[in-house]
Amino acid sequence: MKKFIKLSLISLGIISAIIFIPFLILMFSYDQHADDYYKTPDEFLNSKSFSWYIDIFPKSSRNIFLRTFVETNGMIVIFEANKADEIPLSQLYPITSKGIDYLSDFNIPASQKQPFLDNGKLYCYFYSNNSPYLVSKYYSNNPDLVHYMFTSLRSEEALGLCPSNTVKTH
């Protein structure tokens, strides 16, 4: 009888593993992000994404790439704008040295983040609702263009990256 119970438990364990392992593989291999491309800020403002994310774009913005994360409601947005229309430095706060490591770990293609790693300056930006964003900005070979990457930050991430006197903790 003990052998039967032991054999039954082993069989049940094997059957459970056969069922749950493929389920776990499917669950973790599924991309939990969505990518959208917009040519202009107006195109973004008229999209379904606008209701969830902020309008941070200067009027001359173009080539807008938006990656949204389903699970965390986070976002990464990359765009370019005319240098004459860039976001004023008075709205950006210099970031701590940990910012490059954070930027390196972003879940976006290396080809999109490498120029920001190589040439970008990092800042914190706070939208009108005090939502914190990591901003990387660089100037391209074209002297009239500036490139931006905005990434939403959770409060604990902002505390580790942004100057402490700029972060609201509520």
Residues covered by each model-derived region:
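N-terminal Sec-pathway targeting helices
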Residues: 1-21
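N-terminal export/targeting and maturation segments
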Residues: 21-95
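Alpha-helix initiation/capping motif
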Residues: 2, 69, 82, 140-142, ...
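Context-gated lysine
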Residues: 2-6, 39, 48, 59, ...
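Residue-identity detector for threonine
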Residues: 5, 40, 68, 72, ...
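Extracytoplasmic electrostatic interaction patches
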Residues: 91-170
